[in-house]
Amino acid sequence: MKMRRYKLFLMFCMAGLCLISFLHFFKTLSYVTFPRELASLSPNLISSFFWNNAPVTPQASPEPGDPDLLRTPLYSHSPLLQPLSPSKATEELHRVDFVLPEDTTEYFVRTKAGGVCFKPGTRMLEKPSPGRTEEKTEVSEGSSARGPARRPMRHVLSSRERLGSRGTRRKWVECVCLPGWHGPSCGVPTVVQYSNLPTKERLVPREVPRRVINAININHEFDLLDVRFHELGDVVDAFVVCDSNFTAYGEPRPLKFREMLTNGTFEYIRHKVLYVFLDHFPPGGRQDGWIADDYLRTFLTQDGVSRLRNLRPDDVFIIDDADEIPARDGVLFLKLYDGWTEPFAFHMRKSLYGFFWKQPGTLEVVSGCTMDMLQAVYGLDGIRLRRRQYYTMPNFRQYENRTGHILVQWSLGSPLHFAGWHCSWCFTPEGIYFKLVSAQNGDFPRWGDYEDKRDLNYIRSLIRTGGWFDGTQQEYPPADPSEHMYAPKYLLKNYDQFRYLLENPYREPKSTVEGGRQNQGSDGRSSAVRGKLDTAEG
């Protein structure tokens, strides 16, 4: 009798374990692409995977009598930092809070036939019926026209519309996508279409855009910072920029970015900049440079997020090095769509000294997640996000269980489709010199410790040949400024201003090389010209 009870008890235990395993397996399957027919069985099941709207931090409500937020002519709907008196503007820049605005831009339009189309990615929003060509609505890339018949995407979509106009609806509602855009609503860029995202079948436009926070540590990469502001200025809602009066090596340095922020250099974007000031150097950072490197990102994240107001848990947080610039289209997708997993990375085009030395492959940088995950899993520590260790964090299982999301890291772009740019050591020779002497004491060998490596003529020779400080030479593939994703658009539009980043300033002139070829001797080239060309090629 006892044996029978034990057997019955064991059978119930095994059945329970099988049921739990099956449920977990089914939950995992929900993040793997499967037939649309199965997905369409339960719209409520799909919607349960999207974010809730509870704030991750307490929302700041304005106190009675507070002054209105300042606004600028360029961005009339975006708040500047809290107004300060002129005498305290520079003193308290690193103490003011930043109120995240709501993005009211009309990214999507609804056609008369009921379709929902992404304006910048759509050529034709509605098929005209015979004899009524006047109703044909077209939106070219970058168009900002808004007619009275176009309604903003600010209302609740039906389940059928949120599933991308599938089934029979596709027969009479159609968005014709421009090159580089995909999906039923033409809002999925190429860098997502050809990515390893496992949930492409679940992508749906959001009712309300997320806000995007981009956090950066700055040393002296001011040209690249200017490029970042122009590339992402209309899709990022807050640039959190950390400035310090110490270099990564622990030496004093002037607050150049703070000066540029207050003297009008970045006036066009100042209303979107949250200034973070690190006024100390971490203990032990001089002996172990990685302590300083990690602490910079930790302080940037914690101080910056603590001063952001009106945050929502589904807002996007992206932390970059100053020489890493994500492409606009990928960031805009994260802002406007539901259904992608986290954390996410970017496949970036790699360059050295300038965009003219294109390195093979891509740099895959894990740099983003939602604010909810940043707080719950990473503990508001940006360096943990960068290290791909979400599965070792003690709270990541609790986060999965609470949100119902399986954490699956993915990358925007691919080795063949760049989703950004990583331009390493992209300075003038003087800028490279400053980077050498400012570098942390942890990435050995520390080339700034060698006097010959700091010589400006030696640095110019490295830029000319594409060589490295250890004397090695690499065979880089040819790069042409006309190729796709050669450099951010703002650089190409201001070619003369940034010529030193787009063309090799120390490349041997073509006239000299051609003249040398014409004066070749019986051995193929004269000794003098051979010496010059060998130096150029070496």
UniProtKB/Swiss-Prot annotation:
Taxon lineage: Eukaryota, Metazoa, Chordata, Craniata, Vertebrata
Induction remarks: Expression is up-regulated by CDH1/E-cadherin-mediated cell-cell interaction.
One Pfam family recorded for the sequence: Glyco_transf_17
Known catalytic reactions: N(4)-{beta-D-GlcNAc-(1->2)-alpha-D-Man-(1->3)-[beta-D-GlcNAc-(1->2)-alpha-D-Man-(1->6)]-beta-D-Man-(1->4)-beta-D-GlcNAc-(1->4)-beta-D-GlcNAc}-L-asparaginyl-[protein] + UDP-N-acetyl-alpha-D-glucosamine = N(4)-{beta-D-GlcNAc-(1->2)-alpha-D-Man-(1->3)-[beta-D-GlcNAc-(1->4)]-[beta-D-GlcNAc-(1->2)-alpha-D-Man-(1->6)]-beta-D-Man-(1->4)-beta-D-GlcNAc-(1->4)-beta-D-GlcNAc}-L-asparaginyl-[protein] + UDP + H(+)
Family label: Belongs to the glycosyltransferase 17 family.
GO BP terms: amyloid-beta metabolic process; cellular response to oxidative stress; cognition; lysosomal protein catabolic process; N-acetylglucosamine metabolic process; negative regulation of lysosomal protein catabolic process; positive regulation of protein localization to early endosome; protein localization
This protein's name: Beta-1,4-mannosyl-glycoprotein 4-beta-N-acetylglucosaminyltransferase
Record's bilayer topology term: Single-pass type II membrane protein
Transmembrane region(s): 8-23
GO molecular function: beta-1,4-mannosylglycoprotein 4-beta-N-acetylglucosaminyltransferase activity; glycosyltransferase activity
Enzyme superclass (EC): transferase
UniProt xrefs under PANTHER family: BETA-1,4-MANNOSYL-GLYCOPROTEIN 4-BETA-N-ACETYLGLUCOSAMINYLTRANSFERASE (PTHR12224:SF0), BETA-1,4-MANNOSYL-GLYCOPROTEIN BETA-1,4-N-ACETYLGLUCOSAMINYL-TRANSFERASE (PTHR12224)
Main localization, broad class: Golgi
Expression sites (tissue/organ): Highly expressed in brain and kidney and to a much lesser extent in stomach, heart, intestine, uterus, testis, ovary and lung. Not present in spleen, liver and muscle. In brain, expressed in neurons of hippocampus.
Superkingdom of origin organism: Eukaryota
Consequence the record notes for mutating A536V: In strain: 129/SvJ
Keyword Secreted: no
Pathway annotation from the record: Protein modification; protein glycosylation
Gene that this sequence comes from: Mgat3
Segments in the Lumenal topological domain: 24-538
Effect seen on changing T137P: In strain: 129/SvJ
E.C. designation(s): 2.4.1.144
Species whose genome carries this gene: Mus musculus
Keywords associated with the record: Glycoprotein, Glycosyltransferase, Golgi apparatus, Membrane, Signal-anchor, Transferase, Transmembrane, Transmembrane helix
The keyword Transmembrane is annotated on this UniProt entry: yes
Ranges of the Cytoplasmic topological domain: 1-7
